[in-house]
């Protein structure tokens, strides 16, 4: 028999190990894991009452101390080979708590006569931290320095002191920005506006022949409501407010290329980290790093689309609490979809990736015989090697955004994880929940929807077609 512990403290038998999450505030905590081994339970012990009582006591202690219970799993670890078929159980608990509370819990467990052993696993280091509330994104600004103009001798701005100083001045806006602030405006120079205008005009001319329908629709909305034109560079706050009304996404300024872990974590909260600086004027049609032109011309038209915004968020959610290897696979998926994805549309190949739609050279490469086009397969795309400096050698072609979402969900659901991050749009928080509790909540939601439909049909003259 295996036990399922639920938040309402009910207990039910099933044939799978399972989990429970409770959420309480515990400041200054770190993640700790404990394996608890129990004395064997004999066949004669009615309903395993002593084991069940101990589990209740452990949960009650955690609740009373207001510890954040991340994961709770029980399973039989050993069936003793004797006539009575005695069973030994173990319990895995993952908590967010400070060192003092963990010591107190350890002493409490040691005093329980039904526990045979306690194994404290190595504490997870700070890199295992992930944001729980949208305000935690203030901590997700770890920059990758590989493309900084002051460090890379082949960067077009390396020998341009004025350009480097300009980049530093704009970067200060991002470093000073905090959750809840309005995004400060940047007064762009004539040279920066001219660079923007060159790319804007060049790329808009190929929309009809190369861009997917979702991109074109989004771009036209931005022209209408966010002052997209070749004569001025739109401000992030204006785009942020409009995008939040259309797809629920927001923007926060960033000083440069952030780490994949921090960038994906932002997407989980429907937040896009966006640069405000403009690429060097000497190379307007290609940039070695994300810049405002890449973000505004490449990404924003697609993020206005609700389906594509959902896909981006689901990628981000999958990254929370993931290992470094999983982060690498997810960021590679992002690269071959959101950045450099192609799609089929009415029998034609069209571009949906921001890296293609913000770089004329990349667009030419994507639609030439110099690159390979493969049907999108999520398992292949997740491990495909790519070039983060030059033009891509391979692109993946998806059937639609919806099919891309389906593949991503299947990919996540087959990961084998017992807990899944769930975003609450009302409180703008993320909670780790077991698959069991998610199914339970979904069933409850479906019942409520059916009830509303039943009420609507019973109190109106409407009849089903």
Swiss-Prot record:
The kind of enzyme this is, by top-level EC class, is oxidoreductase
Provide GO CC annotations from the record.
Answer: axon; perikaryon; perinuclear region of cytoplasm
Subcellular location per UniProt equals: Cytoplasm, Perinuclear region
Question: What InterPro entries does this protein map onto?
Answer: ArAA_hydroxylase (IPR001273), ArAA_hydroxylase_Fe/CU_BS (IPR018301), ArAA_hydroxylase_sf (IPR036951), Aro-AA_hydroxylase_C_sf (IPR036329), Aromatic-AA_hydroxylase_C (IPR019774), Eu_TyrOH_cat (IPR041903), Tyr_3_mOase (IPR005962), Tyrosine_3-monooxygenase-like (IPR019773)
| One biological process term in Gene Ontology | aromatic amino acid metabolic process
EC number, UniProt record: 1.14.16.2
Instruction: Write down the Pfam families for this protein, in alphabetical order.
Output: Biopterin_H
Keyword list (alphabetical) reads: Catecholamine biosynthesis, Cytoplasm, Iron, Metal-binding, Monooxygenase, Neurotransmitter biosynthesis, Oxidoreductase
Q: Which reaction is catalysed here?
A: (6R)-L-erythro-5,6,7,8-tetrahydrobiopterin + L-tyrosine + O2 = (4aS,6R)-4a-hydroxy-L-erythro-5,6,7,8-tetrahydrobiopterin + L-dopa
The GO terms describing molecular function are: iron ion binding; tyrosine 3-monooxygenase activity
Cofactors required: Fe(2+)
Q: Where does Fe cation bind?
A: 294, 299, 339
Which pathway is recorded for this entry? Answer: Catecholamine biosynthesis; dopamine biosynthesis; dopamine from L-tyrosine: step 1/2
- Keyword Metal-binding among record annotations: yes
Q: Does the keyword Metal-binding apply?
A: yes
What the entry lists under Gene3D superfamilies is as follows: Aromatic amino acid hydroxylase
- Its domain of life? Eukaryota
Q: Which family does it belong to?
A: Belongs to the biopterin-dependent aromatic amino acid hydroxylase family.
| Protein name, entry field | Tyrosine 3-monooxygenase
Species: Schistosoma mansoni (Blood fluke)
